[in-house]
Amino acid sequence: MAKKSLILLYGGRSAEREVSVLSAESVMRAINYDLFSVKTYFITKEGDFIKTQEFSSKPAEDVRLMTNDTVDMSRKIKPSDIYEEGAVVFPVLHGPMGEDGSIQGFLEVLKMPYVGCNILSSSLAMDKITTKRVLESAGIAQVPYVALVDGEDLEQKIQEIEEKLSYPVFTKPSNMGSSVGISKSDNQEELRASLDLAFKYDSRVLVEQGVTAREIEVGLLGNADVKSSLPGEVVKDVAFYDYQAKYIDNKITMAIPAQLPEGVVNTMRQNAEIAFRAIGGLGLSRCDFFYTEDGQVFLNELNTMPGFTQWSMYPLLWENMGLAYPDLIEKLVALAEEAFAKREAHLL
């Protein structure tokens, strides 16, 4: 049987491009090369598409993908040159211009099947404020928050924050991920600094009530028939799970499955599936929850292209469910082809 061609897109223009490289290298090593041949394309921080390595067998451990530090601009191509009939694209891209609907729209114009959520669900879930409003309408509990838009009366919004919330609070760019631009504030002075930081990344900012809680994550896999994994827990060695701790220092460990009451597990899995359907999710997502000391469950966020690094929660959650990393990739490709066939049929 002829191998299927799988195209990995990685890098990208967002602040999370380094995470994308780590994820792509992990996927590259986990692929079943009896079933797939692999082509990789690097998107630079300027948005150029670079044709990089091809693999017909598992690469050696010392093989590294091209990055912004090693980029060879002589291999630059037109973005549309990635098109290959019958190939499936795995956009291992995180953050804006990656999992926000941009690349998904590009791939739909090219008429190529791709792994993961479509334009609408990707763009919706990428924006924290919009996601919160959609999940509110679905009846899912979330922590109290205040939304800010650049240009609004800052003093009035700070007054609203201090009336509705209590310190500590967390300030987040609405349209970022991987803890980029997120900071904790224990007083108004720190809040002002946090708002300045968040507005550097986005024109819309979310301020959330800080809660003392365990951080629990649930994997989602499927299209209309989405299934959820047993939860896993992020166990931190630092007070705040920021970008530095999450990806660079690796100061976290994970408990899979998380030790939780059965009723809490069921609530989280049910809410994760409801949330996935509420945004119109396809393929995969990771749903993150807070579980407080007094037993409350709050949905924190949906991540439509979770990390795929060797220490990322999402593939480990499915491994715990009996689905090995190579089989997970095979399943995601099959789901991509299923979604593509339905999308094309609706357009005919």
Swiss-Prot record:
Concerning PANTHER family, the annotation shows: D-ALANINE--D-ALANINE LIGASE (PTHR23132), D-ALANINE--D-ALANINE LIGASE A (PTHR23132:SF25)
* A GO molecular-function annotation: D-alanine-D-alanine ligase activity
The gene coding this protein: ddl
ATP-grasp domain ranges (all copies): 132-334
Q: Name one GO biological process term.
A: peptidoglycan biosynthetic process
Annotated compartments: Cytoplasm
Pathway participation: Cell wall biogenesis; peptidoglycan biosynthesis
Q: Which SUPFAM superfamilies match?
A: Glutathione synthetase ATP-binding domain-like, PreATP-grasp domain
Binding site residues for ATP: 162-217
Question: According to its record, what are the GO cellular component terms?
Answer: cytosol
Q: Pfam families attached here?
A: Dala_Dala_lig_C, Dala_Dala_lig_N
Q: Which reaction does it catalyse?
A: 2 D-alanine + ATP = D-alanyl-D-alanine + ADP + phosphate + H(+)
Cofactor requirements of the protein: Mg(2+); Mn(2+)
Q: What class of enzyme is it?
A: ligase
**Record-given protein name:** D-alanine--D-alanine ligase
Q: Does the keyword Magnesium apply?
A: yes
- Keywords associated with the record: ATP-binding, Cell shape, Cell wall biogenesis/degradation, Cytoplasm, Ligase, Magnesium, Manganese, Metal-binding, Nucleotide-binding, Peptidoglycan synthesis
Q: What functional role does this protein have?
A: Cell wall formation.
Q: How is the cofactor bound?
A: Binds 2 magnesium or manganese ions per subunit.
Query: Which residues are listed for Mg(2+) 2 binding in this entry?
Result: E301, N303
Q: Which organism is it from?
A: Streptococcus gordonii (strain Challis / ATCC 35105 / BCRC 15272 / CH1 / DL1 / V288)
Stated EC number for the protein is: 6.3.2.4
Cross-referenced InterPro entries:
ATP-grasp, ATP_grasp_subdomain_1, D-Ala_lig_Van_CS, D_ala_D_ala, Dala_Dala_lig_C, Dala_Dala_lig_N, PreATP-grasp_dom_sf
